[in-house]
Amino acid sequence: MRPPTTARCPGRVLQNPWRSFWPLTLALFVGMGQAQRDPVGRYEPAGRDASRLRRPGGSPVVATAKVYSLFREQDAPVRGSPPAELVQPSWGSPRRSTEAEARRPPRAQQPRRVQPPAQTWRSRPSGQQQSAPRARAAPALPRLETVQRPRAARGRLTGRNVCGGQCCPGWTTANSTNHCIKPVCQPPCQNRGSCSRPQLCVCRSGFRGARCEEVIPEEEFDPQNSRPAPRRSAEGPPSLRRSSVARESTTARVRPPAPQLQRARTLSGLSQTRSSQQHVGLSQTTRLYPAPAASGQLTSNALPMGPGPERRDGAPQAAYLDRPSSSWGLNLTEKIKKIKIVFTPTICKQTCARGRCANSCERGDTTTLYSQSGHGHDPKSGFRIYFCQIPCLNGGRCIGRDECWCPANSTGKFCHLPAPRLDQEPPERGPRHRAPLEGPLKQSTFTLPLSNQLASVNPSLVNVHIRHPPEASVQIHQVARVRGEAEEAPEENSVETRPSPRLPAGPGPGRWDSNRIPARSGEAPRLPPPVVPRTPALLGRCYLSTLNGQCANPLPELTAHEDCCGSVGAFWGVTSCAPCPPRPASPVIENGQLECPQGYKRLNLTHCEDVNECLTLGLCEDSECVNTRGSYLCTCRPGLLLDPSRSRCVSDKAVSMQQGLCYRLLGPGTCALPLAQRITKQICCCSRVGKAWGSLCEKCPLPGTEAFREICPAGHGYTYSSSDIRLSMRKAEEEELARPSRDRGPKRNGTLPRPAERQPLRAATGTWVEAETIPDKGDSQASQVTTSVTQLSTWVPGGALGTPTPSVPEQGIPEAREEAQVTAPTNVLVTPAPSGIDRCAAGATNICGPGTCVNLPDGYRCICSPGYRLHPSQAYCTDDNECLRDPCKGRGRCVNRVGSYSCFCYPGYKLATSGATQECQDIDECEQPGVCSRGRCTNTEGSYHCECDQGYIMVRKGHCQDINECRHPGTCPDGKCVNSPGSYTCLPCEEGYRGQGGSCVDVNECLTPGVCTHGTCINLEGSFRCSCEQGYEVTPDEKGCKDVDECAIRASCPTGLCLNTEGSFTCSACESGYWVNEDGTACEDLDECAFPGVCPSGVCTNTAGSFSCRDCEAGYQPSALGHTCEDVDECEDPQSSCLGGECKNTAGSYQCLCPPGFQLANGTVCEDVDECVGEEYCAPRGECLNSHGSFFCLCADGFVSADGGTSCQDVDECAVTDRCVGGQCVNTDGSFNCVCETGFQPSPESGECVDIDECEDLGEPICGAWRCENSPGSYRCVLGCQPGFHMAPTGDCIDIDECANDTVCGSHGFCDNTDGAFRCLCDQGFETSPSGWDCVDVNECELMLAVCGAALCENVEGSFLCLCASDLEEYDAQEGRCRPRGAGGPSVPEARPGAHPPGPVRMECYSGQKDQTPCSSLLGRNTTQAECCCTQGTGWGDACDLCPDEDSVEFSEICPSGKGYIPVEGAWMFGQTTYTDADECVMFGPGLCRNGRCLNTVPGYICLCNPGYHYNAASRKCEDHDECQDMACENGECVNTEGSFHCFCSPPLTLDLSQQRCVNSTSGVEDLPDHDIHMDICWKRVTNYVCSHPLHGRRTTYTECCCQDGEAWSQQCALCPPRSSEVYAQLCNVARIEAEREAGIHFRPGYEYSPGPDDLHYSLYGPDGVPFYNYLGPEDAIPEPLFPSTAGRPGDRIPLPEPPLQPSELQPHYVASHPGLCCCKNGEEVGSEAVSLPSSPSAHHCQQEHQAGFEGLQAEECGILNGCENGRCVRVREGYTCDCFEGFQLDTAHMACVDVNECDDLNGPAALCVHGHCDNTEGSYRCHCLPGYVAEAGPPHCTAKE
């Protein structure tokens, strides 16, 4: 490969290398992507473009291909630059060309220094040439060496950029990886620049150059040109001037150049011109850059060049040419006023069903939209289009015709120049106004070639922007100029619609008014070569998460893959979804592609910009979205908080911490049954526990109301935790918010900014909207508001905006523009505008924003509202930041608000408000009480000062403390100093003290000689005392010692004679057993045990004056005198007798002789020998069961016990006379067989011979047309038909239709024909006659006893009437008695005869003992008056009305059948109520027979008390029996407990096996209770008090049986206590809560559960007959069994009461606390639909819909494997989950409820089982307490016995 040929400039001079550097740098960025390396590391073009770049001469590509040497030195000359005449001239400026040349070395040579050319040329304005000094030669670019990867043992290189097992040139491996993804820049990038691609440095702001080695100069602002300029250009006046060459009118004559031309430098190479004459506009030098077309060639930017003014950027542009333009600089878009855009929309909608979503797209009509002045709008289709004739580079965005909005890193008309350094203040932005469109629109941009242009060269590219609904996508077919219409009259935009084939036609063609611009004449158009348009990005559905492996939470609009995965999306797809690829943590460029981190998107080839997620619909539900850098925040209004999902606002009342009482019962005006602890309102009302809350008894809101959703946003059973929710009312911090990218514009230097003129568009609603607005810097929500045309996220410099001017004539040079006029005050703007246009009406009401628009003849004026000011753009009002003026005057912190401000005063100041003005005023602290006590207060600014009084000192601000003068030693030198407030006092010293340094010190009297003779002197504070020697005592004044007469004390020589001496005494003549000690002061005891032979077989213990024998050996005891040990006859001691054997005494011990069947254990107890172990005494005909001292055989079926029960023999079943009737009996071992005769067969149930019914088994063929009659053992055939049939002529037997006679059943019934017979079905009130052939009336008055009570009964046909004796009374069918007319409650309408009365009222039932009030205790809830008063109740109703006496008339009316009988609801006989026995055990549940078992009888009930209890008829419960009154608890202390007792023994005694006696640990016991010393049968099941299913293989004790699997024990079938009782808890030493849990699983009310095992524990009634809701508290009680059996047998008219039936699936649907379940009175419907139970026609319950997302499910409906065992399946919004029972926790990995090991949980609230051992169980745990402790519940623990 050879270097491209270069051409020298023939006679042209390049003036300034700075003006050519930036355009060529841009060409470098584009050209490098299409180039390849040469062997020395340089880039050469690749592919078919290589030949073009090697062309000699004036191709514009040559400048691009030769730009690389500029990086060596920017002032180096460049060879082969194009001739100056081929460069596109700017408007009114001389043509410029590059000044430097670069030369590339040959391929095989090392780079060498470039030699400068012999001569360079500089261009003059007149076109002459002059010589210029030579430029410096640039140093050679160093050769790029191939970077070798580190020699690490990581294996072979993988991934991209790998060439031949090594990293490709320019790449190296990243740290700790084997991937070649790290680019290499040599030499490295300077000034902290980053190497983004090989040999490509991305510079930080403020730096530039190939290696970021150059600092960008600071800029100055030229107020006349409004363009940035380098601060270093100090030459020339501030007004940068350059001559302009203009063309007058439409002729080709050239105006002479202006005099006094001065050269000026601009930062970006743009030459700017301002003429003092009539030349108006900004001139711009055209730069070359590669267009993003497929050809890869560099094309012009299609700048308008034609004559006349051209409106660009809102300002008139005049172009003047000094010569005809060449073909390379043609104006390709000149006079393009009307554009035709042909596109086809595709509407895509999402359809979701059963958790699956699918996109359905429908292609719309092909629409042709004619856009004039760059804008077009289809008001019917909802599409808005504007196009750009120029492409915007580096991520720029087209916002109008020939107008680019550039990102922060670029500037210039096409965003092709690097941005200046960001060290200046950004321009202030106006607020963005959301366009009043019909709905949110989405913008799509397409870069397409413009067809039908005026020049036959490379087509110009335009950007077409289409705003359309989000669910639509658009395909552009053609963008073309409308030919032949340039000379026509002013045109209007129009829309043409062409229906697509096979689809219904879309909206028809429509027209709309737009801005009319006069058309101008132009050159004839020439067709361009065809170019394939670019395909828009594919749109799909964006999903936020997945659920059960499927994509979920889709966004409502279709998005592109990059927009979805780069912002909030996790999955994306069109027909199916795929996960989004991972994003890097920071921007990374790999293989030329820029990878942006999450929350950012590509701005250009090297920069990423923040994604405004708040533009995405559906992110923050019921909250406000705030965009942040790389993410977003959901904020709530004051009073609302974000929930844990951070996407939903809930009321702060949902997490209120205010606590109060929760009431479980709400009556008329009263609250009752409060909970013991105070809880919050949401826990009380959201958990269904409470009905009212708080000190004011606030009623809990009803579900579905707004008040309920306010405190329970998640519904019933769920509350929010305050620790999971944080207040979100703060504003996002400045560093969190996403700042829009911005171009730092120049400072304004006091001049007014020129507002951008925007062409108004007419929206579909007919209102006027702005085509574009400039964002305001102070608007915090600028990044969240979209305009009606496009969404912009960048700032533009103020100088880049033009100034609105009046219209100009079509031909000729425009006059000098008028400057904008500003009038006082500053918030009023007068803007010139074309006459005749009402700007205030055109801008609707928001043209000025928060202000008033005043129309003027030449414009309009904005009068801003208070708190607002005129925006620097002079176009509207914006918020006035009053804080900039320091309205708080430094006394507080100013916080600006929209239209106002707030002062937060510092300490020492207070807020003073006067209208809209706020200020901080000083607080006079001296006026406040308690300030500067004991001092003088002086107020200061923001504070105060205290001056203390004399005698006080300041210790802290505002507090004067007394000075303690006594601290100074010289205050009182001869006395005691006493301090006083503000002063002090000197006092004289007391006796024993002397003055010293202001205080009194003690005098040491012990220093005086002769003090305390016969003792020691002890100095005291102010005195002294004497401590005397032994034998002396202190005198009364304690200042001397005297002798003690020891003999006067009785304790001296108690066993001898005492003699007193001075200071001592002596003893003599001691008693027996004592002797005088050595010093003679005492008679000491004589130790007899020191002599040998004392106390044989024992231990000698010395005593005072004697001795004794103690601790005799085993079998011995001390004698009567205690001097010897004698043998003990243990057989005479009842406590030492052999238990179950005979005792024999021995020397020092005894022996036990056991009877047969027993064996000696522990030497003292005869234990039973288990003969069944190891021996098969009863096998194989029975099972051996051990007994006390023997055994017996439990024989199998067919065997009987023999030999005294020790063996089993066969039973001869054939000995029974009636065995095997119709056959012969054959006895077998353990059974028998029947050999049946012909016509008989063995019965599969009993084995007996039963007759074979041949007529039934063989059917009709057996007798043919004859009738078959069965007989024992045979059958016979009889000629004729069965009764009820007649023989047809064909010989067949046909049924006789007796019902053909209409009168066969009379007039009160109808006939029902049956096969061979008929029956009469009678009307209500009639019954079948004895003959069965007709219906007769039923006399209810005779049949039903006292059916009308005390009223008269009158029988009528088919019914009966109850008549009252007095006309002033009427019969109340509901109460069953006569009542005065109009008295007592609401009138009851008269029921028709035979109608069922409404259901009775159900209320509370009370009972009381004889010596207490009748309403002392609550017996039951939800009972009728008859159920209460006819059974055990003494009071009924809310007011506890007393039940009538049994001998009263009222009692007969309520209970006509007597005590114990109640009416059956829904069961009627002949129009009368049916009465049956009341099951008190079911009706009152735990209210009866507490601590026992309730057994229903007819009538009444009986109580079977648990062991340790006796029945108390007065209280109707089993009360504890005090065993301590009956038994002595021998040798110990008896303590009674509930249902039992305990014996406590004192050491060395211990409790024996009977637990009732304290015995010596070495002795035995006797007379133990049978159930403790005996091992007996353990029965596993008890059915109707009959024991079955014995525990095979072993016998157990009573405790072992009942505490494990047994329900009864011993051959007497002794029942075990219920597992939910206290007796069971004490017997088995477990806590009460454990006993309740073992009794069965009790469910939470209000839910639907999965099916459970069909056993006793899962039924609606517990093992002790108590309904399961008993464990849920009285508030959850249900009125009656909800599954009553009323079906009975077919012939029963009065169904007998049966236990509640267990449904096939455990579905507690009708619990009282179930959502929507109401206790309805009188059959009313309360709040929802009343549903009748199929088994009870009169029983109603109210049912309403579950709250969505929180209902329970049955197993077959649950979407979880195994249906949540140990829990319940609950459907939530995301699918299914398990609500585990207590003691289980959810394992989310397996979606199962697993047991919680409470014993291993060291993080629990308290240590478990203190004073005991913790044993984990399935779903719970139990505590095994140590001796001396008993188990307690809540939480389970062990407490000491009382």
Curated annotation (Swiss-Prot):
GO terms for molecular function: calcium ion binding; growth factor binding; heparin binding; microfibril binding. The keyword Secreted applies. Disulfide bonds join 185-195, 189-201, 203-212, 388-398, 392-404, 406-415, 542-564, 551-577, 565-580, 614-625, 620-634, 636-649, 662-684, 671-697, 685-700, 686-712, 840-853, 848-862, 864-877, 883-894, 888-903, 905-920, 926-937, 932-946, 948-960, 966-977, 972-986, 989-1000, 1006-1017, 1012-1026, 1028-1041, 1047-1058, 1053-1067, 1070-1083, 1089-1100, 1095-1109, 1112-1125, 1131-1143, 1138-1152, 1154-1166, 1172-1184, 1178-1193, 1195-1208, 1214-1225, 1220-1234, 1236-1249, 1255-1268, 1263-1277, 1281-1293, 1299-1311, 1305-1320, 1322-1335, 1341-1353, 1348-1362, 1364-1378, 1405-1428, 1415-1440, 1429-1443, 1430-1455, 1481-1494, 1489-1503, 1505-1518, 1524-1534, 1529-1543, 1545-1558, 1578-1601, 1587-1613, 1602-1616, 1603-1628, 1758-1769, 1764-1778, 1780-1793, 1799-1814, 1809-1823, 1825-1838. Heparin binds at residues 332-342. CDD domains: EGF_CA (cd00054). The keyword Repeat applies. Keywords: Disulfide bond, EGF-like domain, Extracellular matrix, Glycoprotein, Growth factor binding, Heparin-binding, Hydroxylation, Phosphoprotein, Repeat, Secreted, Signal. Residues 181-213, 384-416, 610-650, 836-878, 879-921, 922-961, 962-1001, 1002-1042, 1043-1084, 1085-1126, 1127-1167, 1168-1209, 1210-1250, 1251-1294, 1295-1336, 1337-1379, 1477-1519, 1520-1559, 1754-1794, 1795-1839 form the EGF-like domain. N-Glycosylated. The modification Phosphoserine is found at residue 494. May play an integral structural role in elastic-fiber architectural organization and/or assembly. Forms part of the large latent transforming growth factor beta precursor complex; removal is essential for activation of complex. Interacts with SDC4. Interacts (via C-terminal domain) with FBN1 (via N-terminal domain) in a Ca(+2)-dependent manner. This is Latent-transforming growth factor beta-binding protein 2. It comes from Bos taurus. The gene is LTBP2.
